[in-house]
């Protein structure tokens, strides 16, 4: 039980963010499901075949008793389980098509969903923490060990002729830099002279006309993000900025997080609390103007993006007005240098247009804070304007629609409405009574009369 609770809690924290249920709530839900005979063991929760019966049973219980706590917890857990399963299938497909091995040839069906690795190893009493390399090694076909060399020198012992390393494995291929970034053009090329550089490490490469300078910051591969999203558009680059005692430093955004955010926007909508939590997490670091505009292009459609640009400009004008009144405003750099202006904050000043490196070098820490905060506030406004709350009162379960899909649509509409939080659960239960299919309504009519009162 404890192992399952830990696995489910971890999945909910990953896919639900701030709305994830506590371990206590998950444990109470699992205990109830076992008590009602819906689960033979806690690990049966991983089987998709048990999800619909659990949803129907918890819904009926909520309608009879008027308590929706377990139903709400199950809704979050179900969303996390579905997201984890979809991500697993996508990962296995990517491994197969890229020829990486360790994955299934075809995506698994609903009946063959696997338990998480942590749960499987806890059940066997073995140590937790098997690495991905170990799992891939177990699943990959066995190969006959043969001597392998690279060029004229053995990778393992460095001997040019007569190498005795019969079991030495081939070295990993050198990383080939993406053509998207000129600063990575020299990565992976062998040096004509001098000592060998460790494989996988980036070669220092000076900018044109500046010999001896350190390499530029690592950039997020937005081309990879675009491929994962199967979308077309101009190549984009992002550099989240972190300010420390030594000056600005850059850490690349994780493409997987951006892909997940775009998927959340597509499935949950802009007004969903889950969407807002993921956007706030991605924008918790200081971003450049180039960053925020490209991020919004990925997650917003053309019309919402135009609305966001207008709202962002209004927010930046507010910052400029405050900086004009106060010469020592953080956006003015505490009175050092020129005052901030709209061109600087939008990345349109000299040396910044289309140049994220120039933006990182010329923008002050206070300006970066203002840019990111204004972009986030503009996104909140667009979420309210571009995607008004759906009419939850008009939602009805379709003839061929599963109860789970109907419940998801209804809960999404109610959560995105202007109803106070205390009224949402009763409204959801009332809609279940009136808008569900006849068989569900029959169950409700068979319930005690207190449910209808």
UniProtKB/Swiss-Prot annotation:
Post-translational note: Gag polyprotein: Specific enzymatic cleavages in vivo yield mature proteins.
Tree of life domain: Viruses
Pfam family, one: Retro_M
InterPro entries on file: Gag_M (IPR004028), Matrix_HIV/RSV_N (IPR012344), Primate_lentivir_Gag_pol-like (IPR050195), Retrov_capsid_C (IPR008916), Retrov_capsid_N (IPR008919), Retrovr_matrix (IPR010999)
GO terms under cellular component: virion component
Record GO biological process: viral budding via host ESCRT complex
Motif PPXY motif per record, residues: 172-175
Molecular function terms, GO-annotated: structural constituent of virion
Compositional bias ranges of the Basic and acidic residues kind: 128-141
Residues with site note (Cleavage): 155-156, 166-167, 177-178, 239-240
Annotated stretches, region: Disordered: 128-150, 181-217
Keywords: Host-virus interaction, Viral budding, Viral budding via the host ESCRT complexes, Viral matrix protein, Viral release from host cell, Virion
PANTHER family to which the protein is assigned, alphabetical: ENDOGENOUS RETROVIRUS GROUP K MEMBER 24 GAG POLYPROTEIN-RELATED, IGE-BINDING PROTEIN
Entry note about domains: Gag polyprotein: Late-budding domains (L domains) are short sequence motifs essential for viral particle budding. They recruit proteins of the host ESCRT machinery (Endosomal Sorting Complex Required for Transport) or ESCRT-associated proteins. Gag contains one L domain: a PPXY motif which potentially interacts with the WW domain 3 of NEDD4 E3 ubiquitin ligase (Potential).
Further comment: Gag polyprotein: This protein is synthesized as a Gag-vMyc polyprotein.
Record protein name field: Gag polyprotein
Gene: gag
């Amino acid at each position: 039980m404890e192992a399952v609770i830990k696995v489910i809690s971890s999945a909910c924290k990953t896919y639900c963010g701030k709305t994830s249920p506590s371990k206590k709530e998950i444990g109470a839900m699992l205990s109830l499901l076992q008590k009602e005979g819906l689960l033979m063991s806690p690990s049966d929760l991983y089987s998709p075949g048990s999800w619909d019966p659990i949803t129907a049973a918890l819904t009926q219980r909520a309608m009879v008793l008027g308590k929706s706590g377990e139903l709400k917890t199950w809704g979050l857990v179900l969303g996390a389980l579905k997201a984890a399963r979809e991500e697993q299938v996508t990962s296995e497909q990517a491994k197969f098509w890229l020829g990486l091995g360790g994955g299934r040839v075809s995506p698994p069906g609903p009946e063959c969903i696997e338990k998480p690795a942590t749960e499987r190893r806890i059940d066997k009493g073995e140590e937790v923490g098997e690495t991905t390399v170990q799992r891939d090694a177990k699943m990959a076909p066995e190969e006959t060990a043969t001597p392998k060399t690279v060029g004229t020198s053995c990778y393992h012992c460095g001997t040019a002729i007569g190498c005795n390393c019969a079991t030495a494995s081939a070295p990993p291929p050198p990383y080939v830099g993406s053509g998207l970034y000129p600063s990575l053009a020299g990565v992976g090329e062998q040096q004509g002279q001098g000592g060998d550089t460790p494989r996988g490490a980036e070669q220092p490469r000076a900018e044109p006309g500046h010999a001896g300078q350190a390499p530029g910051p690592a950039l997020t591969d937005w081309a990879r993000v675009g491929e994962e999203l199967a979308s077309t558009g101009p190549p984009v680059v992002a550099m989240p900025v972190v300010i420390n005692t030594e000056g600005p430093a850059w850490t690349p955004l994780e493409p997987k997080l951006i892909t997940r955010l775009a998927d959340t926007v597509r499935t949950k909508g802009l007004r969903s609390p889950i969407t807002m939590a993921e956007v706030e997490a991605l924008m918790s670091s200081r971003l450049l103007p180039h960053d925020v505009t490209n991020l919004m292009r990925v997650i917003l459609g053309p019309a919402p993006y135009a609305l966001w640009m207008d709202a962002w400009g209004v927010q930046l004008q507010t910052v400029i007005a405050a900086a004009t009144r106060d010469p020592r405003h953080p956006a003015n750099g505490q009175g050092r240098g020129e005052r901030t202006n709209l061109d600087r904050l939008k990345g349109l000043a000299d040396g910044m247009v289309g140049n994220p490196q120039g933006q990182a070098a010329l923008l002050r820490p206070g300006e970066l804070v203002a840019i990111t905060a204004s972009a986030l506030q503009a996104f909140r406004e667009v979420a309210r304007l571009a995607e008004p709350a759906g009419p939850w009162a008009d939602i009805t379960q379709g003839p061929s629609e599963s109860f789970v899909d109907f419940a998801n649509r209804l809960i999404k509409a109610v959560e995105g409405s202007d109803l106070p939080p205390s009224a949402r659960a009763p409204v959801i239960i009332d809609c279940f009574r009136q808008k569900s299919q006849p068989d569900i309504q029959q169950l409700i009519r068979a319930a005690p009369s207190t449910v209808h009162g």
